[in-house]
Regions:
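A general structural signal for short secondary-structure junctions and capping/turn motifs
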Residues: 1-5, 74-77, 99-103, 135-137, ...
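Non-heme Fe(II)/2-oxoglutarate
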Residues: 1-81
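Short hydrophobic/aromatic beta-strand or adjacent loop that forms the aromatic wall/cage
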Residues: 9, 106-108, 162-164
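Short beta-strand-to-loop capping motifs
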Residues: 16-18, 113, 167-171
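Short, charged, solvent-exposed linker or helix-capping segments at domain edges/interfaces
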Residues: 68-70, 77, 121-123, 176-180
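Secondary-structure boundary elements
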Residues: 76-77, 114-117, 172-174
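Catalytic core of non-heme Fe(II) oxygenases with the double-stranded beta-helix
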Residues: 80-150
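Catalytic core of Fe(II)/2-oxoglutarate
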Residues: 124-182
Length: 182
């Protein structure tokens, strides 16, 4: 069943088959995400957690082509997004990707490879107070569009690697991107 909720996220019916091993998907390290934002610091007042470090990698031209072929050409005519691979592993029961907004993209399409039953949480942040407003649990091989301008986090399963291919839109907002995926 496809799920669509307010302006945070939308599941879409897109599938990608990756040939070869997951090790072949990634290439050069693009970025390590470990900076704390005010949203995560606010949640830390109420929830004891450790921030996991997520790493994004560049992908091969073959993977880029395969992923971009799943995006409507009309959307690609507006913006050619950056394609990347992310992996993060929780070290213990308190590990999470803390609440954050993505500072360099405003929308992403995530092609989930391994999710371990982990849930993505969305928050409202106002006057230093953070409150959960929505969440979704993606399964392996599902595709979701996320509004990355709204604070979000992921509670990680210990010693399990979360993996996905992502597509970053730097200029095209969530509302416009989802309009191409009815």
């Amino acid at each position: 069943m496809l799920y669509d909720m307010n302006n945070c996220f939308k599941q879409i019916d897109v599938k990608i088959k990756f040939n070869g091993s997951l090790a072949d998907i990634k290439s050069d390290l693009h970025m390590s995400h470990s900076k704390w934002q005010k949203y995560g610091l606010s949640l830390k007042r109420d929830v004891d957690y450790d921030a996991a470090i997520a790493n994004t990698f560049e992908v091969s031209d073959e993977i880029k082509s395969e992923v971009l072929s799943t995006i409507p050409i009309e959307l690609l005519n507006i913006e050619i997004p950056h394609v990347w691979y992310l992996e993060v592993t929780g070290s213990d029961d308190t590990s999470m990707i803390p609440p954050h907004i993505d500072s360099f993209r405003i929308c992403t399409i995530n092609y989930y490879i391994n999710t371990n039953g982990e849930t993505t949480h969305y928050y409202k942040y106002e006057s230093g107070v953070i409150k959960e407003i929505d969440s979704f649990c993606s399964n392996d091989n599902e595709c979701w569009i996320l509004n990355t301008t709204i604070p979000h986090s992921v509670k990680l399963v210990p010693n399990k690697k979360r993996q996905m291919i992502g597509v970053s839109f730097l200029n095209t907002p969530f509302e416009k991107v989802i309009s191409f995926f009815p």
